[in-house]
Amino acid sequence: IYDNIAIVSTNSYIFNGTILDNLMVANKSASEKEIVKALKTARLYDFVNSLKDGLLTYVGQSGSNLSGGQKQRLALARAILSNREMIIFDEATSNIDVESEENIWKAIYDLSKKKTILVISHRLANVKDAKKIYVLNKGKLVEEGSHDSLMQNKSYYFDMVNKQEELELSLIHI
């Protein structure tokens, strides 16, 4: 099973070395074309190209020379390069800026056309466009369906979405 799954989590590990080193961990025989495609899909290509040393840029211990969003997009590019059948995103956008989050979600939806994608998220706005949403409560599956069908059911998911939207609105007005 492990050989078919890649994971991008909140704290995906970035190795001490270069951007290229971090990518090659996923696929030691990756071609330049595959690397460029992974970087473009992860919305990281322009950033890497803007760096003086490009792919050979040293990222520092645990990616200390990169922002949170850049680290997550590097982890995403690495997952893409691994060419696994399934990619699991476990709260992958929870600790990053809005622009990076938007870029990562665009990449995730692009990937979902060719790969099986599993998104674990407490931010329900992140899963509205998913083909299928599974709602768990205390470890048990309580609902499944599209966003629209779950909202029409006016059950557990509906309540969670409304509570989350109310909370976000109240935070805006503070």
Named regions from a protein language model:
Residues S67-G68, L74-A79, N103, V119:
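ABC ATPase nucleotide-binding domain "signature" region
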Residues Y45-L74, I96-E99, E166-L171:
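ABC-fold ATPase nucleotide-binding domain signature/coupling loops
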Residues L81-E85, K114:
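A short, proline-enriched helix->beta-strand linker immediately N-terminal to the Walker B motif
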Residues S50, G54, K106, K128-L171:
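C-terminal portion of ABC ATPase nucleotide-binding domains
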Residues I87-E91:
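Catalytic Walker B motif of ABC-type/P-loop ATPase nucleotide-binding domains
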Residues Y2, L20-Q61, W105-K106, K114:
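ABC ATPase nucleotide-binding domain helical subdomain, centered on the C-loop/LSGGQ "ABC signature"
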Residues N11-A30, L66, N126-V127:
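Conserved catalytic motifs of ABC-family nucleotide-binding domains
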Residues D110-V119, V127:
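Conserved catalytic loops of ABC-family nucleotide-binding domains
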